[in-house]
Amino acid sequence: MNNLHRELAPISSAAWSQIEDEVARTFKRLVAGRRVVDVTGPGGADLAGVGTGHEIGIEAPLEGIRARQREVKPLVELRVPFALSRDAIDDVERGAEDSDWQPAKDAALRLAFAEDRAIFDGYGAAQITGIREGASNPLLLLPAETAGYPAVIAKALEELRLQGVDGPYTVLLGSDAYTAVSEANDQGYPVLEHIRRFVSGEIIWAPAIAGGCILSTRGGDFALHLGQDVSIGYLSHDDQSVHLYLQESFTFLMLTSEACVVVRPE
């Protein structure tokens, strides 16, 4: 037994398999940060912190002694509760392939958005500085007309090169910006294809954020440290519902502030 207490849930192995598949598929489709940062772990539920390699001066215990404390970033644990119908769960044993797992998918969306927003925009309460929050390059504005997006992205790439940041370079765009650029044409030529001509990496849909960013995926600039990866745990049940939760623990290190250019709508 572990602290997820899954063996106490009135859920068959077949139903667990369907629930896990829906959660994994939904989380993977929605999360963007893991596609562009270095991911270390999972190190396990007992991983409590990650050393930054830095020291902080503290008061010495005796005269003539220098005291330094190692800086450690504690992991944050996120939990999203949800409930599933007993009927939906039991129907799997009767051969159902269409049980309603929407509450599990909704929980996966919330967890994916929470992780991505911590990675890109920071999470002060968890001592996390996000990529866009910590970026040192000038902010660029996306014009109202999507035909102007390629010029802005080209300028962002130029800024990265001027800062000595090598590629490959990847573009992340929030839902509104990604949809707009996907549907747009410039004199009959798709704007998205125009951007792809000079971006060496991917153009990624990042629904958790507004605006977007252009960054290097060369490695060594951004680090996500996982303790417990996304897991499903059991809380309680009654004659109608089974109460479960999604849980993960992580911290994020912003290592190179010049490796990202933030873009926002005008």
Spans of features found by a protein language model:
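N-terminal "assembly arms/tails" that initiate or stabilize quaternary assembly
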Residues: 1-68, 227-228, 233-241
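Long, hydrophobic, amphipathic alpha-helical segments used as structural scaffolds
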Residues: 34, 38, 115-122, 161-164, ...
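Sequence/fold signature of self-assembling virion shell proteins
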Residues: 40, 184-266
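Long, hydrophobic/aromatic-enriched structural stretches that serve as scaffold segments
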Residues: 52-98
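A generic local secondary-structure boundary/capping motif
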Residues: 71-73, 158-161, 232-234
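Alpha-helical scaffold segments that mediate packing/assembly in large oligomeric complexes
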Residues: 90-155
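Short, catalytically relevant binding-site loops at active-site mouths
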Residues: 125-128, 176-180, 211
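Extended, solvent-exposed, turn-rich assembly/linker loops in the middle of proteins
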Residues: 132-194
